[in-house]
């Protein structure tokens, strides 16, 4: 069950004109968020920024693929905002990748919808920076966990 209290509202008022920013927030527990919630609030309502609370919009995990592809197509920049959980993206964000970034649309034959777009990661961890060092708790520098995003 996902925390539905204190969920931010999506900003889907159509202010994401071609060349805008599409910020996708995927935090399953907003009440516990110290950073993601504030970052989402700061971006919400800014001109040219469309925001999506992924868990708030799709609590049943039934993603509207066509609507999401249209939002991505309208954006010049896609920002993924979420905590790192078990050294990876939260489950609903992964499902979003699998269902929205499809063969023939995002990649493969004629899959050029992402061409010319930028992707920024705005990810947070529950541990301090020094825990992401060789010999420390997480054993690796944080960048070692980023190749799956780079390949996507």
What are these regions (language model features)?
Residues 48-62:
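A short beta-strand-loop structural module common to alpha/beta enzyme folds
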């Amino acid at each position: 069950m996902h925390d539905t209290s204190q969920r931010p509202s999506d900003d889907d008022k159509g202010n994401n004109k071609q060349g805008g920013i599409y910020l996708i927030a995927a935090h399953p527990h907003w009440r516990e968020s110290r950073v993601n919630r504030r970052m989402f609030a700061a971006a919400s309502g800014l001109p040219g920024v469309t925001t999506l609370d992924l868990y708030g919009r799709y609590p049943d995990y039934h993603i509207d693929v066509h609507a999401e592809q249209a939002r991505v197509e309208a954006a010049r920049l896609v920002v993924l905002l979420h905590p790192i959980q078990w050294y990876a993206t939260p489950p609903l964000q992964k499902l979003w990748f699998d269902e929205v970034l499809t063969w023939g649309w995002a990649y493969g034959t004629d899959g050029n919808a992402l061409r010319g777009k930028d992707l920024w990661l705005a990810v947070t961890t529950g541990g301090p920076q020094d825990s992401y060092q060789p010999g420390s708790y997480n054993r690796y520098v944080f960048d070692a966990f980023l190749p799956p995003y780079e390949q996507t």
